[in-house]
Amino acid sequence: MYKKATLFTLLILFCSVQLLGADFTCRIDLLKGEKWWGVFIAGGRPMPFDAPFQKIDLSQGRGQKTPFMVSNRGRYVWSAEPFSITYTGDSFLIESSAGEVKAVSAGRTLREAYLVCCHKNFPPGGNAPSPELMTAPVYDPFLELGFEATETALCDYADQILKAGYPAGTLVVPAGWQSSIGSNEPSMHLFGDFAGMVRALHDKGFRVMLTVTPFVSGDGPIFRRYRGEQMFVSRPDSTVAMAEWDGGYSAFYDLTRPEVYELIKGRLDALRSNYGIDGFLFDCGGAMPYLKYAQGGAAAYLSRWSELSDGCDFCQYTVSRGTSGLVSYVHNLRLDHDFDWDFLRRAASDMVSANLLGYPYTVVSPRVSKLADLDRVDPKVFLRYLQLSSVMPVMNIAFAPWNITDPAVAASCKAIVNDRARLGAYYEQLVSESKRTAEPVLRHLEYEFPRNGFTDCDDQFMLGSRFLIAPLLDGKNSRMVRFPRGIWVDASGKRYRGPLVTTVTASNDHVLYFESEKNGEIEYMVVLYFESEKNGDTKKQGN
């Protein structure tokens, strides 16, 4: 009885709620030493929050946002609908038209707050991406082949991958594959035999993933056919909303209308059954500023958009917001940032933060527009990005590393990609656990080691509970590593006893990772780089 009364008092003290017309306003004051993560899935603010920010409406803008926050003091904030939020530095002000939003006490740690919120509001449903996405790279040839990649170009690209000594994986078909944008039918002009091309790529060892968007060309036959049937998102003045994206300016389907959703879902099912397509890369980023005009609103639109992958475990999303369950697909964060050293630092931080917000299978990629002038990019940036990608749940490759002119960097890139398969079994284990428990695959150190001074550590992370990853994020081959309590073993068998802060040098651009020694034993030691440079023999490092 005493504990319940105390909790009730705290809620009143730290969350004052008042009804203003149709809006609910809640102020959440920070507890002593409390740090918060949330709201911005990518490209928003450094986390945990430090600097104040002005009022932000989560239902508007292009950035990827979520009405979910967690704190290192065991509290969380969650809403099924977007809200507006302001941060003063010592309190949050949340305004919502959908109902009261408050801070809920779920325990004492970041992990407890995250897991309680997940299981209460969007529990794991037992679904997860295909293991094949974890063990082989995903190649996106948009940069080299352009928007309208042809059958010949795609098959030639697959041959280049294999000829260069890279493993087969998943090949993404850019969004211009349709006969008319919005038809969801292959172009006979680009593909003489679409099903035959898919079979040929399968024979080479590749899986095929189609880029799918909600867009419809404003001057095409699909738009003219459906314009009078309220199939598209419209502005309040009844004019059709036109969004800018890679294909120009286009209308887009209103998936919150049941008949529209069923139409698109049926087309995607037909692409799989009629042509042998393995999965889809869903991209609705250009539509984000206008989703608030959808019949059901922005949250309902993104929820229905996320449901298009139901029944297919071979999918990626660039933007999504499912609220009925834990995300069960690969979430591909595309950062709108120049491809440079700062991009790498932001990618590492955003990737770990996204794992704290209900996206356990998150990867980070640069936008293609940021890769337009590759000749000016330091070759080591490519190398470091591939190293970082190699420890993500899915290894996405958005450029052709076999075309890098620096021979040493090119050789290192190929070794990294080929050695990715060594992590496959461990990732399968993590994904199998995550789909049942909701545990993130990549974990913030504060999540795994609470109250040990890691709240501000955003350039290291845990891969499950076994591996500490300290990615190299600049041109140097060494970096400062913060070791938690315990014994940590590197690829050479060297041990580090934590807590410890020390500089570690990576030999020959090896990925810096360390396995936690449990009861004097090392279970995995599946490193990305442990091939002997002298004779090419694979050596397993012992303890």
Please provide the spans of the model-predicted regions.
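Short, intrinsically disordered, low-complexity terminal segments
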Residues: 2-3, 19, 503, 523
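Short, Lys/Arg-enriched, disordered terminal segments
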Residues: 1-6, 22, 538-543
